[in-house]
């Protein structure tokens, strides 16, 4: 029997946090409580004090009532939700529910292998967990593997372009595990043992979260790492982008055309190279002669009732001000990054003219200050949002020595996976300190656990434009959401679409029916993501390239955008629930239907909020799916090899309806949104629908507000809404409103209108309004409708009313 001792100690600087330490051999195991059912476990190979401030976890330990019981072999620690059993001889831990049913157990002792980390002694650390053979787990970030359950995954997890590994999973059994390490980390699944193994670490350091169900686990994640701030209302409207607008006039022409054509839009996005050549990379100034007056450009965007977002990077060219400032202080990394060539207009890159671009050390607070000081030049022009590209960051032809660079927080190797968190957090914190008049909005390519607290929407990177990749975006977004971060989106139409150019009659992709179908379906799916943004390379994405009003493809694209705007009261109210109640936008079906085996395994359907069942069309129905077969199909920028000719594709007629089959989860009634037809759950239903119709259902027992037809999100007040009631069970919904921007809501300046539906009495009660804000419309008209078309119109002045239907 190894030497064992038990200590109850209080951590200095905390509020009497309960910490239990078990000495095991030469090392020790420490269990620290953050809430009932939420603990931190730290295992070290020595008894030296392990002191490290988590970058992801912001919560402090709490005093929790813990019952202690000791036997010869085991220490039992119990709170109101779970029991933790620590084996004295090995330090292995078993987690049980309060009623002693086993939740999960560690598979073995922690493994420590001595390694040299840039001249400092450290360890490669590993801990396994014994799972049931058929136990499904979810999370691990944005992975393009098409899977819902991530069992069987064996790979490295780290930030990337099209994939972002997040060191967290949650189980269908209602618990989650966050591995708090920032070095490159592998996850392995040997059938019954799932293990994390990190390249360097002074301890095994992880958090166990018992939530009882998926929502409870997500709530625990946000309790530990921070809640989601409200994003501005405009960020839920439609956004148009491309790689890239080559002048300020081109950007304005697109916006003017949209306003002329009646295409709703809230944001224009400017991609890279507005700064000029690559030696001026990310200068945080408009140096290109094609952008002679950026202030006038932004002012005109605002005059057109739209917002402007701009691309910024984690690296700087050698001729820029921020480069010189950072270089003087030793705050630039010497790693190979994008762009590789200083010549921006030639492809492939001219390696004989290296760009000299270098990544900045975002781990340094001084470097983050310099970053913002330079970015403020653009902020002061009136820029509304930041597109933070390459936040992983890009790192080509890496060598082991690249990771030896010291960051101020340790070696680059030891903190690599925290790069997105640090650089995104730096911009968020600085803008919050600057002003509360507008909300921070960030679009970023990479993510670290806990990043949801920084007002950032993560997109899935430069994905290739294929049907297979479209299908993969659904489980990628759902698993990412199950890590606690609700803000996911992808490039509508995919990013690399060059394989559709010239593959049909030598015509550009925007005349290719195969791309028409893919782009339309991707856009339709994008209605049901937190951010709806059209973007990509090789092919222009603006609607007017795809026909005109009355033609099927154009009508499908425009119809998707218009539907998005009609749903804004529902979406914005859901965003409040995400912020206040720790809710989730894109809800994997396991969250709402955990006992429906078929539903929880589906990777092509999901709930969008609590009412909408999204059943997007993710397969080609009118054109061939396969465009390229060769190895270059996913290689990125368009190459001249391997194109599949599509000249035989004739007489594609999108005016004909198609068939679509959707599964409706058991335990609910379901209403088809477009005609109100009701179906029982637990079955597949086959629909025949026109190309422009997006198939989705409303759950029985839901209240769905429908907004006005608008050209931008704030064009009309929500003073005349349709309130659709879908019977089947009792229902509740809270209509949320505020000014749409700014942080007044943090001081309680917002309104909530609770609504409840009594299914037995068929009565909708609109309760007293709670709260108010500047500019609030005090009186409203609600048209209350049922799926069969029956309706009543009522006036509401903030006082409770009941409507019997």
Task: Please name every model-derived segment.
Residues 1-20:
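Bacterial Sec-dependent N-terminal signal peptides
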Residues 51-67, 639-647, 672-691, 790-805:
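Solvent-exposed beta-strand/loop surfaces of large extracellular or lumenal domains
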Residues 101-686, 690-692, 699:
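Catalytic-domain carbohydrate-binding cleft regions of carbohydrate-active enzymes
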Residues 693-800:
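Accessory, solvent-exposed terminal regions and/or long lumenal/extracellular loops of proteins
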């Amino acid at each position: 029997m190894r030497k064992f001792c038990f200590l109850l100690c209080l951590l200095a600087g905390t509020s009497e946090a309960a910490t239990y330490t078990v000495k095991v051999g030469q090392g020790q195991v420490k269990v620290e409580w953050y809430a009932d059912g939420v603990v931190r476990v730290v295992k070290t190979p020595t008894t030296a004090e392990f002191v490290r401030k988590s970058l992801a976890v912001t919560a402090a330990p709490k005093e929790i009532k813990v019952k202690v019981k000791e036997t010869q072999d085991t220490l039992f620690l119990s709170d109101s939700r779970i029991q933790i059993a620590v084996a004295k001889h090995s330090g292995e831990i078993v987690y049980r529910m309060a009623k002693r049913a086993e939740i999960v157990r560690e598979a073995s002792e922690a493994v420590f292998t001595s390694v040299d980390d840039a001249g400092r002694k450290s360890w490669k650390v590993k801990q396994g967990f014994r799972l049931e053979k058929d136990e499904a787990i979810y999370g691990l970030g944005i992975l393009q593997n098409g899977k819902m359950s991530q069992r069987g995954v064996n790979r490295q997890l780290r930030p990337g372009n099209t994939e972002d590994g997040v060191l967290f999973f949650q189980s269908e059994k209602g618990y989650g595990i966050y591995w708090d390490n920032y070095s490159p980390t592998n996850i392995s699944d040997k059938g019954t043992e799932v293990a994390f193994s990190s390249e360097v670490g002074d301890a095994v350091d992880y958090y166990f979260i018992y939530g009882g169900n998926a929502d409870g686990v997500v709530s625990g994640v946000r309790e530990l790492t921070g809640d989601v701030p409200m994003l501005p209302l405009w960020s839920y409207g439609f956004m148009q982008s491309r790689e890239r607008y080559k002048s300020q006039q081109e950007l304005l022409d697109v916006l003017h055309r949209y306003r002329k054509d009646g295409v709703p839009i809230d944001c224009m996005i400017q991609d890279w190279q507005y700064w000029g050549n690559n030696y001026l990379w990310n200068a945080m100034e408009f140096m290109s002669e094609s952008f002679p007056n950026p202030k006038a450009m932004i002012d005109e965007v605002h005059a057109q009732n739209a917002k402007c977002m701009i691309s910024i990077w984690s690296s700087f060219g050698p001729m820029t001000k921020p480069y010189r400032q950072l270089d003087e202080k030793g705050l630039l990394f010497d790693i190979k990054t994008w762009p590789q060539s200083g010549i921006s207009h030639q492809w492939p890159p001219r390696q004989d003219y290296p760009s000299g671009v270098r990544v900045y050390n975002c781990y340094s607070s001084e470097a983050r200050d310099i970053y913002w000081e330079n970015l403020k030049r653009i902020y002061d022009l009136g820029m509304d949002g930041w597109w933070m590209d390459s936040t992983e960051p890009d790192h080509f032809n890496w060598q082991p020595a690249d990771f030896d660079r010291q960051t101020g927080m340790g070696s680059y190797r030891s903190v690599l996976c925290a790069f997105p968190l640090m650089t995104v957090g730096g911009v968020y914190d600085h803008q919050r300190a600057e002003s509360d008049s507008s909300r921070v909005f960030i679009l970023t390519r990479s993510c670290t656990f806990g990043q949801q607290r920084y007002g950032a929407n993560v997109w899935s990177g430069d994905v290739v434009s294929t049907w297979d990749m479209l299908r993969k975006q659904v489980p990628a977004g759902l698993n990412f959401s199950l890590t606690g971060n609700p803000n996911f989106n992808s490039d509508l139409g995919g990013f690399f679409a060059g394989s559709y150019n010239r593959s049909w009659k030598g015509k550009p992709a925007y005349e290719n029916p195969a791309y028409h179908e893919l782009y339309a379906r991707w856009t339709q799916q994008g209605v049901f993501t937190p951010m709806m943004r059209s973007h990509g390379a090789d092919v222009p994405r603006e609607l007017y390239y795809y026909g005109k009003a009355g033609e099927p493809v154009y009508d499908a694209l425009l119809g998707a955008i218009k539907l998005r705007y009609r749903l804004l009261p529902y979406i914005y109210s859901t965003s409040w629930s995400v912020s206040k109640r720790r809710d989730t936008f894109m809800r994997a079906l396991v969250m709402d239907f955990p006992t429906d085996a078929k539903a929880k395994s589906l990777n092509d359907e999901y709930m969008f909020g609590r009412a909408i069942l999204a059943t997007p069309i993710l397969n080609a129905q009118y054109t061939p799916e396969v465009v390229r077969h060769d190895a270059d199909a996913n290689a990125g920028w368009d190459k001249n090899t391997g194109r599949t000719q599509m000249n035989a594709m004739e007489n594609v007629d999108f005016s004909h309806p198609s068939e679509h089959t959707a599964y409706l989860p058991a335990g609910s009634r379901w209403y088809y949104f477009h005609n109100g037809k009701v179906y029982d759950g637990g079955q597949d239903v086959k629909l025949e629908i026109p190309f422009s119709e997006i198939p989705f259902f409303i759950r029985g027992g839901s209240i769905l507000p429908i907004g006005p037809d608008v050209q931008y999100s704030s064009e009309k007040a929500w003073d005349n809404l349709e309130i659709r009631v879908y019977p089947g069970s009792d229902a509740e919904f809270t209509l949320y409103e505020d000014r749409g921007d700014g942080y007044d809501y943090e001081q309680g300046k917002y309104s909530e209108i609770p609504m409840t539906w009594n299914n037995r009495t068929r009565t909708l009660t609109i309760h007293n309004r709670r709260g108010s804000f500047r500019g609030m419309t005090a009186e409203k008209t609600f048209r209350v409708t049922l799926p069969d078309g029956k309706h009543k119109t009522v006036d509401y002045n903030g006082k409770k009313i009941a409507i019997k239907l």
